């Protein structure tokens, strides 16, 4: 029954939202692309992929950790932490070599002398030991389906082993272990095996193409061949294409575009890690600006509305040592979180598992710890709950162009906490939920002006160095309430304040006393202000324009 107080447009939006909420837990409908977005084929509404990688491409031929926990427990943990998707890795040899196709999980673990791991599987997942490897994968995918988790099947390697080295024989078409015909055969088999599996929503063709054989022309020929093979075997799934240079380069696409007829199923992917970049020793704002610019130029451009062939970009790998002991990782993380939030990309964290059954490239080869994993070494707890909490806001769509076309407003995202600037009780300003009505602001970051709370006459003001930021209604004051982005990375919000010495200084919003937001003298906005050990990242805030207001009003 229609309420007399509900406008027809709002009612249609509410109906669409309810359809989305009903569909979301099962993720059972095929997906397709519309411009730069991934959408539900049935409703046309956006679906954001917030995934975690689950490694299964190594020598044992089984997704990791099933010696530690029942598969249902792993699946429900993934879901409970806010991930709606798993990028599940596999090897081509698992599908094409008799050493795997004619073997059970138990036989492969025996061949690798993984007696202790096999004993753990017998305790936690006894039904897996007598299954073949592909059947075991089916079992894992089914458990993820029961937990409402979508799956992306990712061909990581041909020969099962750790990835990636330039010369490991798995890098590019024609390498020692990378026979293109066998690769296409394996893709077709995997697509066929999972053809009637609703929660398998995408297949990624190959991880981190690399090496001396790499050329854009060879990439174009082989990747389109693989994509066509997958689409023919399973036309429902999205087909994800990785780039060159360890999945950091798609810059050749404007001159060598993909010409497949099923454009609505094509997604591109990119990787971004801290490796080889002076995050710890360089000027933080400059390093973040330069690395963000590099990624946008080489990969991120595919989503641009200025690009006639705009398509979704899936950040299929990013991650850090989750112990927070690596300064390079820690500084990179704040930069990439700001980028992921601003661009509202689909993404997959590397990684889930806290250890591996067997890694031939490491010592010890058995039970090697993975400090990038969100589980700890023995999978008994979450390694770093604070890190996981920082992902919560970017697990949600920030833009929803097909449900809520407007009005637009701004959120002010703080990557060091994963929270947003929120107006509190009284005149306080603190870090809180990005979904809150009181975290919606009117602010044009391109000009100097007030940061006004949407629907009110109040704006943010500074009281001085080291003091809490406050809300005020005196929003036309020449200082204290007029804010600008003041660093090369465009991540610090500062206002000019007259000091006791009669000189003006820049005061920046600062989240170092989280959840309270204070204002402190801006750090590192110029080279001369950034001496060793100064780190401005608690002052990093990203202003993001969003249109989620209608969505959240309807949910209320």
Curated annotation (Swiss-Prot):
Signal peptide: 1-28
Organism: Chamaecyparis obtusa (Hinoki false-cypress)
Any one of the GO BP annotations: polysaccharide catabolic process
Gene Ontology MF terms in the entry: hydrolase activity, hydrolyzing O-glycosyl compounds
Active site, UniProt feature: 208, 473
Keywords from the UniProt entry: Allergen, Carbohydrate metabolism, Glycoprotein, Glycosidase, Hydrolase, Signal
PANTHER family: CELLULASE FAMILY PROTEIN (AFU_ORTHOLOGUE AFUA_5G14560)
Physiological role: May have glycosyl hydrolase activity.
Residues forming coiled coils: none
Superkingdom of this protein's organism: Eukaryota
Disulphide bridges: none
Name of the protein in question: Glycosyl hydrolase 5 family protein
């Amino acid at each position: 029954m229609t309420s007399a107080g509900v406008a027809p447009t709002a009612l249609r939006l509410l109906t669409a939202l309810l359809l989305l909420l009903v569909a979301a837990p099962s993720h059972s409908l095929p997906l397709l692309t519309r411009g730069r977005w991934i959408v539900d084929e049935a409703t046309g509404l956006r679906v954001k992929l917030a995934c975690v990688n689950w490694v299964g491409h190594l020598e044992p031929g089984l997704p990791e950790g099933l010696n530690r926990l029942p598969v249902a427990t792993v699946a429900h943990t993934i879901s409970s932490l806010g991930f709606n998707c798993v990028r599940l890795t596999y090897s081509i040899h698992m599908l094409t070599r008799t050493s795997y196709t004619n073997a059970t999980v138990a036989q492969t673990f025996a061949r690798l002398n993984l007696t202790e791991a096999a004993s753990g599987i017998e305790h936690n997942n006894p039904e897996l030991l007598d299954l073949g490897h592909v059947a075991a994968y089916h079992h894992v995918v089914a458990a993820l389906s029961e937990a409402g988790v979508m799956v992306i099947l990712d061909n990581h390697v041909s020969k099962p082993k750790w990835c990636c080295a330039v010369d490991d024989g798995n890098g590019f078409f024609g390498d020692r272990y990378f026979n293109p015909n066998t690769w296409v055969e394996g893709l077709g088999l995997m697509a066929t095996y999972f053809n009637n599996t609703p929660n398998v929503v995408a297949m990624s063709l190959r991880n981190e193409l690399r090496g001396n054989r790499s050329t854009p022309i060879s990439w174009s020929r082989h990747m389109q061949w693989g994509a066509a093979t997958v689409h023919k075997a399973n036309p429902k799934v999205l087909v994800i294409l990785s780039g060159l240079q360890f999945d950091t380069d798609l810059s050749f696409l404007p001159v060598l575009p993909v010409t497949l007829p099923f454009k609505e199923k094509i997604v591109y992917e990119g990787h971004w890690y801290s490796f080889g970049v002076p995050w710890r020793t360089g000027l933080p704002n400059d390093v973040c600006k330069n690395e963000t610019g590099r990624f946008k130029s080489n990969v991120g451009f595919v989503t641009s509305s200025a690009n006639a062939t705009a398509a979704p970009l899936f950040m299929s790998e990013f991650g850090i040592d989750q112990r927070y002991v690596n300064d390079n990782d820690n500084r990179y993380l704040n930069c990439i979180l700001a980028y992921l939030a601003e661009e509202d990309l689909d993404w997959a964290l590397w990684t889930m598992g806290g250890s591996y059954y067997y890694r031939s490239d490491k010592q010890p080869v058995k039970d090697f710890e993975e400090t990038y994993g969100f589980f700890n070494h023995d999978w008994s707890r979450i390694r770093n709950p604070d890190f996981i909490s920082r992902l919560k806001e970017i697990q949600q769509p920030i833009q929803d162009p097909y449900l809520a076309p407007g009005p637009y407003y701004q959120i002010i995202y703080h990557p060091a906490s994963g929270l947003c600037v929120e107006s509190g009780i009284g005149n306080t300003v603190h870090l809180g939920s990005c979904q809150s009505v009181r975290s919606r602001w009117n602010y044009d970051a391109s000009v100097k002006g007030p940061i006004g709370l949407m629907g009110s006459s109040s704006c943010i003001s500074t009281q001085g160095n080291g003091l809490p930021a406050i809300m005020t209604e005196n929003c036309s004051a020449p200082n204290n309430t007029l804010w600008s982005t003041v660093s090369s990375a465009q991540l610090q919000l500062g206002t000019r304040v007259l000091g006791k010495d009669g000189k003006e200084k820049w005061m920046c919003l600062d989240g170092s006393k989280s959840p309270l937001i204070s204002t402190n003298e801006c750090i590192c906005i110029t080279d001369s202000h950034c001496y060793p050990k100064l780190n401005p990242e608690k002052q990093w805030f990203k202003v993001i324009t969003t249109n989620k207001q209608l969505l959240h009003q309807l949910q209320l």
